[in-house]
């Protein structure tokens, strides 16, 4: 179903300039496909993912954990825009693979906190660095104001897709 602001209203037709921008998006898609992703993934992480039948949806949890403190399953669900049962299932698979660890929140024993297993921190950091190289090279060529504009546009797009 096309994204519309109002139910039943057809989406607006893009301008020629907008068509040129939208036309760039499919050119990025192969970079996010399985073979390219697997080639960039460190062996330890790739083996754990493949051995335990983990999918890109499981992989989407990992950068969230790399960036900071342990997260609750509810916070993971919120960030990934998935249901709580789905987030719980994703965390369960990652936990069985040994990629993440689950612990009780000392402040609330009913709440489970999820963190990246230390053995997988360095491989995941390497993977994120490899995946980010083309983007970081592109950003290097932009002025600070162009970077700010790029970030604003990308953030707005993510917001639209997720809402």
Regions found by a protein language model. Give the residues of each.
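Charged, amphipathic alpha-helical coiled-coil/dimerization segments
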Residues: 6-8, 92-149
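N-terminal helix-turn-helix DNA-binding core of bacterial DNA-binding proteins
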Residues: 38-83, 97, 113
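Short, flexible segments with low predicted structural confidence
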Residues: 31-34, 47-49, 66, 92-93, ...
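Terminal interaction helix/tail motif
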Residues: 2-3, 13-31, 122-163
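N-terminal leader segment of winged-helix/HTH proteins
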Residues: 1-53, 116
């Amino acid at each position: 179903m096309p994204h519309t602001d109002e139910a039943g209203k057809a989406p607006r037709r893009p301008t020629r300039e907008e068509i040129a921008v939208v036309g760039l998006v499919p050119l990025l898609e192969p970079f996010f496909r399985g073979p390219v992703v697997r080639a960039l993934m460190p062996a330890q992480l790739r083996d754990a993912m493949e051995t335990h039948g983990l999918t890109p949806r499981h992989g989407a949890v990992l950068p969230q954990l790399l960036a900071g403190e342990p997260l609750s399953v509810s916070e993971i669900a919120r960030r990934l825009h998935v249901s709580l049962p789905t987030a719980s299932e994703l965390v369960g698979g990652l936990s069985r693979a040994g990629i993440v660890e689950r612990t009780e929140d000392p402040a609330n024993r009913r709440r489970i906190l999820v963190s990246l297993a230390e053995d997988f921190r360095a491989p995941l950091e390497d993977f994120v660095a490899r995946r980010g190289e083309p983007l970081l090279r592109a950003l290097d060529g932009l002025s600070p104001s162009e970077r700010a504009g790029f970030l604003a546009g990308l953030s707005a797009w993510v917001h639209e897709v997720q809402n």
